[in-house]
């Protein structure tokens, strides 16, 4: 993979300051700065997704074989097979108002959020982010975001990505990536241990919203899922439900 250009701004650190130290209120100064940092009202749109109950985060949470085959250790999880499973009716389907608008209970949200930020479990915990299309978008199909691979299924991302590839050739490909001169704790748009995607060039509102949740800090994730409760966080511990979740998105 290309070395790309050097990166200086620690986005994870900066976006972590979206909320105060206790994670209870927004830091208005940081919010105002971030409005300016991202182009084309991207931060406004992403922030809107986080505040308007349109983003759903599903976490595979089971000692069942899918997790075990992937090496997941659900060490701190008291698995309860009877609760918090996502029923079929709450899974996204094209053209429907999908999902329950309520989260799991507070303890469960906290435990799931911890799994997504725990150094031992975060890279092994399967998760899926789905964004419900809003009215002004042409397609009513739910949008699938894979923040780990820095991928989004929306048209905005596809245009952005193909534009970089086709308009600039090899130079465009190299321009997609950034590296740090030194070791960094910046996880924002990170695709491997040495490489970050150039998030000023390859990004969309859904990826930015997802990265704010999963690539900043635990207090930010808990702010939107537990304090403000504007992002729904569900556990899935049933393979059929997990497959339905995929089948509804992948044609
Ligand atoms: Zn997108």
Curated annotation (Swiss-Prot):
Compartments reported by the entry: Nucleus
Annotated spans, Disordered: 83-105
Gene Ontology, cellular component aspect: nucleus
Main location: nucleus
UniProt keyword terms in alphabetical order: DNA damage, DNA recombination, DNA repair, Nucleus
Highest rank taxon of the organism: Eukaryota
UniProt-listed GO biological process terms: DNA recombination; DNA repair
Job of this protein: Plays a role in a RAD51/RAD54-dependent homologous recombination repair (HRR) pathway to repair MMS-induced lesions during S-phase. Required for error-free repair of spontaneous and induced DNA lesions to protect the genome from mutation.
Family: Belongs to the SHU2 family.
Name under which the protein is recorded: Suppressor of hydroxyurea sensitivity protein 2
UniProt organism field: Kluyveromyces lactis (strain ATCC 8585 / CBS 2359 / DSM 70799 / NBRC 1267 / NRRL Y-1140 / WM37)
Gene: SHU2
